[in-house]
């Protein structure tokens, strides 16, 4: 049963233990006390950058092409791609990043509880 499997793999981390790439969250008004995540958080090595890529669910052909070209230009660089988990540009960004060997982090706007996921 997928719902149970997902719930068993959800972890949390308190703000006192955020890895370096999450520390900017502490600079916003009312930062989160805890972050929930599934899977493994990537190791943040010296020189690795984190880049957010977001866009429309109802993208144009140009939007798709330019997203893929921009990410292709990052091939081989020490970059982690962060995007939503929505259909459209978010999904295109994740797929292209994975195709060229980059690490990705998905941040669904609806939270990670299975019943709340919305593409």
Segments and roles (model prediction):
Residues 2-119:
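Glycine-biased, small-residue-rich flexible motifs in mid-sequence functional cores and linkers
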């Amino acid at each position: 049963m997928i719902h149970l499997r997902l719930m068993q793999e959800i972890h949390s981390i308190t703000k006192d233990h955020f890895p370096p790439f999450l520390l900017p969250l502490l600079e916003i008004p009312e930062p989160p006390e805890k972050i929930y995540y599934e899977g493994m958080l990537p190791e943040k090595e010296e020189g690795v950058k984190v880049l957010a890529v977001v866009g429309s669910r109802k993208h144009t052909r140009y939007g798709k092409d330019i997203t893929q070209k921009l990410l292709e230009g990052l091939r081989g660089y020490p970059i982690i791609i962060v995007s939503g988990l929505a259909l459209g540009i978010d999904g295109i960004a994740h797929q292209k990043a994975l195709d060229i060997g980059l690490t990705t982090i998905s941040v669904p706007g609806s939270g990670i509880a299975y019943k709340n996921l919305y593409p």
